[in-house]
Design a protein with these regions (language model features):
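Sequence-level preference for short, compositionally simple segments enriched
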Residues: 38-92, 96-428
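Short, Lys/Arg-enriched N-terminal segments with co-localized hydrophobic residues
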Residues: 1-10
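C-terminal motif of bacterial Sec signal peptides marking the signal peptidase cleavage site
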Residues: 29-31
């Protein structure tokens, strides 16, 4: 994960235009007095009545700019056009051999039109980054193979890279040129003044566009086990836009694999809008905080697989940095959590932890610092995870996890964590 200098200031000020008052007034959540909450302070459980308030409809009720929010979003399955796409990418014999080439050409031709652009990617390995700029038309990148493994976008990018090394890795063949639609994204990273590029520039696929879709392909940050178990953020996919759909995809990495983010065109964390992301029928792999960010995200029938091969001393799946006035962060339902053989002994992975973004110097400030929200419901969790204490201390501040088990609890009480379970099946 990453710290934003300006984002930290904004977080401290909490210039969020009253998210609860604006968007969620009817959803002030309080425990049901007729049902005693289950669980412990280290593993709190929701009652059926409480869990019923966390639905995809409510996570996706509104999004976009808080000053003029968009209405409800009800994602339907991604459908492909019946006619062959005009934009086709293949390792050879196609109009484009690089995905970024097709993205640039499609945007240049269509401009800001609202008609969706479908880019067909033939089976093969594409070693490149793919950047989708803010304001692009709706774009669907889809793999033409029978399985998502047949189309793979990959590159090894480490948050610890110097700017010079980033330039060499990402743009050695002038994949990004001034005047290209995504040039500004590359330039934001290629001319940083910091010693390293940081998490924000370590993504293989990075979309700042609304209505972005990925279907039937794999994205890998192939840094993987080439580095030690220390801090080496390597993002496979980062999204900043609203109404993002990921369907039948495989996202592979180690630390920080999937970043469901909310940033502006200048690559700064913002608190004045909400991004919504829907992940369906997919696979995500990593070791530390490998699904993280501020978006309202729903994961439906997703397989989360935690690996130990990098020998990291800690392992966490989810790390949301939900704004304190937003009742909704991550909803995981009908999903599966597994781990490899490294977690079959006394060393266990955690389901997640809050990300107290921006509070490294101040410590957690109740009502001001981000307070990550998660509900994992109706899912299967294998023996790789810590059943008694599945949630870790917060990232950035090391704030100890504290679950609310009061019979009269409010589920958004800022004095407590907001990481919950409901009706999960833990394998012995």
């Amino acid at each position: 994960m990453v710290s934003f200098i300006r984002g930290e200031r904004e977080m401290r000020k909490i210039t969020i235009l009253g998210i609860s008052a604006l968007l969620f007034t009817p959803l002030l959540l309080q425990g049901c007095a007729t049902q005693t909450p289950r669980g412990t302070t280290s593993r709190p459980q929701l009652t059926a009545a409480e869990a019923a308030t966390f639905t995809i409809e409510r996570y996706f009720a509104q999004g976009g700019a808080l000053s003029a929010p968009d209405g409800p979003w009800s994602p339907s399955p991604v459908h492909l056009p019946q006619t062959e796409s005009a934009w086709r990418v293949a390792p050879s014999g196609a109009p484009f051999t690089r995905i970024q080439q097709a993205v640039n050409a499609a945007i240049d031709q269509h401009g800001a039109q609202e008609a969706r652009i479908y880019i067909r990617i033939e089976p093969g390995i594409y070693r490149e980054t793919v950047y989708i700029p803010e304001g692009a038309p709706p774009i669907t990148l889809y793999g033409a193979g029978g399985r998502p493994e047949e189309v793979r976008i990959e590159l090894a990018i480490d948050s610890q890279f110097s700017v010079a090394r980033y330039r060499q890795r990402v743009n050695s063949q002038q994949q990004y040129r001034e005047g290209d639609p995504a040039w500004y994204q590359y330039a934001l990273c290629a001319w940083r003044t910091s010693k390293t590029i940081g998490t924000n520039c370590a993504a293989v696929v990075w979309s700042q566009s609304a209505d972005f879709q990925l279907l039937n392909l794999s994205v890998a940050n192939s840094l993987l086990d080439t580095v030690d178990g220390g801090t080496h953020q390597g993002v496979a996919l980062r999204t900043d836009g609203d109404r993002v759909q990921l369907e039948n995809v495989r996202l592979l990495g180690r630390q920080d694999t999937l970043y469901v983010n909310t940033s502006n065109r200048r690559n700064e964390a913002v608190t004045d809008r909400i991004s919504r992301v829907y992940v369906k029928d997919s696979y995500v792999e990593g070791d530390v905080d490998y699904v993280f960010g501020r978006a309202n995200a729903v994961f439906d029938n997703v397989h989360f697989h935690t690996v130990s091969t990098r020998r990291s001393p800690e392992a966490y799946v989810l790390a949301p940095n939900t704004l304190p006035d937003n009742p909704y962060g991550f909803l995981v339902k009908n999903s599966r959590f597994t781990g490899d053989g490294g977690y079959q002994g006394s060393f266990k992975a955690k389901l997640g932890r809050a990300w107290d973004q921006g509070a490294g110097k101040t410590g957690y400030l109740a009502g001001k610092t981000a307070n990550g929200q998660v509900l994992i419901a109706n899912s299967t969790i294998d023996q790789s995870y810590d059943r008694l204490s599945p949630w870790g201390a917060a990232a950035t501040t090391a704030r100890p996890f504290r679950g609310n088990t009061s019979a009269e609890r409010q589920l958004d009480d800022v004095a407590f964590n907001r990481l919950w379970e409901f009706n999960n099946r833990w394998q012995p």
